[in-house]
Regions:
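Short, structured secondary-structure boundary patches
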Residues: 45-46, 60-64
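Short, solvent-exposed alpha-helical "recognition" segments
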Residues: 46-57
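Positively charged, aromatic-accented nucleic-acid-binding surfaces
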Residues: 1-29, 33-38, 63-121
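Key DNA-contact positions within bacterial/archaeal DNA-binding proteins
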Residues: 39, 43
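Residue-level detector of alpha-helical secondary structure
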Residues: 29, 44-47
Length: 121
């Protein structure tokens, strides 16, 4: 079986974000990216999946937990959803990067996104 190539998001201490290729990250890599604990990352991921906002990558390996099957890797859509749900310095830096890349660095749009984030929590 051919293993698919995957990439992770890299964030430096000065806030520089590097996203290259086909982003697929494990829960532990996501926790490291946002500077949070594994269990907290997993809890946020499950809440986002339950709300139907984003899903994991079921085309790669999966983990069975009782009768449920969870993907082992999550893509950019989940990472973006998490960045607007998690409150950490790294999540804030990633939100800024996302807004800059989307061409929406306007503070009014940023305030709107923060208010929607409050509803998610």
């Amino acid at each position: 079986m051919k293993e698919e190539k995957r990439e992770v998001i890299i964030m430096t201490d000065n806030g520089t974000v590097t996203v290259s290729g086909h982003v697929r990250m494990s829960v532990s890599e996501i926790a490291d990216l946002f500077g949070i604990y594994y269990r907290e990352a997993k809890r946020h991921i499950r809440a986002i999946e339950k709300a139907g906002i984003a899903q994991g990558d079921y085309t790669m390996s999966c983990i069975a937990d009782g009768l449920k099957v969870y993907p082992e890797y999550y893509g950019l859509e989940m990472i973006i959803a998490l960045s607007f749900r998690i409150q950490s310095k790294n999540a804030q830096e990633l939100r800024k990067w996302i807004l800059l890349k989307a061409g929406a660095a306007d503070s009014r749009i940023e305030a709107l996104l923060y208010s929607k984030n409050i509803v998610l929590n």
